[in-house]
Amino acid sequence: MTKEKSTVPRLRFPGFTDAWKQRKLGEVADFSIKTNSLSRDKLSSYFYEVQNIHYGDILTKYDAILDVCNKELPSIIGSTISDFADALLSEGDIVFADAAEDSTVGKAIEVRNFKGKNVVSGLHTIVARPKVSYAPYYLGYLINSTAYHNQILPLMQGTKVSSISKANLKSTTVVFPTLPEQEVIGSFFSDLDQLITLHQRKLDDVKELKKALLQKMFPKGNGNDFPELRFPEFTDAWKQRKLGEFMKESKILGSKGDIARKLTVRLWGRGVVSKKEIYSGSSATQYYIRKSGQFIYGKLDFLNQAFGIIPPELDGYESTLDSPAFDLLKGINGQFLLEFVSRKEFYYYQGNIANGSRKAKRIHTE
């Protein structure tokens, strides 16, 4: 066993002063637990005796801690406990996804709260079972930290699909304080996750409410001048006009693509932002200056709700004519316009009557 090294984090809870220990993961965890290579078609949402952790779910569905009792896991079709007796997971096991199409390879979960359920680890996974006592949740959060994952990045292999080997995982370093400090850290991050889940549910509820109100607070057309639902102080009939009467396309000549400060319209109504590669591009591509308050959309992503109002901080940034921008004329409010065009019945109808295939429709300004 190698000599233990000590380290101290920059931020820690008050009352703890002891140095942290540093060890190779292969020294403190057993990697001999069996996994299976069952594909998705061998799994079912119906309950069988043995449930399975698939690497794809680790990468996309599960957080750092997998609460088995309160999470729906796929079952292995026709499985019995005797078939997998030597592969059953235990409380506190760490399960790594050893393959991915990007740098998420090595993402892991700490498995907790079995409550009698029988769970095994599946395709493209590696199980690390702690050989020493760790506080609940501590390892799960540690191994999903940026500091730990940065150790994995140079150890990845492959081009189109990246992978990490069991030997390389064993060579990575884990750090840990005393058990009482581990308990405080684990509980802290667990509480944060629960808070995030609570707010996510509230957010989902508000999104559903907004979706319903967008259907009811605009007239449905076909000669209907009144919305189904409106604020009580307003009783006048709504007017119906062509959108072009309220906006004028802006074509202020800007820079070429190699020097333009670029902006882009995010999908699904998530606003207008600067591009990460702000100054990269072709010197042959012409860009146009955009102004704060203009309405802008993506021609190729019209069906993906690529609409926005340019914010003040992006005043003077540029886009090509594939993301045209419009000055809004008197008589229309920019936020009202944005909500109006963000309704599914609007952008789906306009997109479906446009020319081009479903995957490559370019919605022109006229």
Please identify what each model-predicted range represents:
Residues 1-17, 201-236:
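Short amphipathic coiled-coil heptad-repeat segments
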Residues 13-14, 185-196, 231-232:
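Hydrophobic structural patches
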Residues 29-176, 244-366:
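DNA target-recognition domains and sequence-specific DNA-contacting regions of bacterial/archaeal
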Residues 22-23, 198-200:
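Amphipathic, low-proline, heptad-repeat alpha-helices and/or compositionally biased low-complexity charged/polar-rich
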Residues 12-36, 171, 229-253:
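Non-catalytic DNA-recognition/assembly elements of restriction-modification systems
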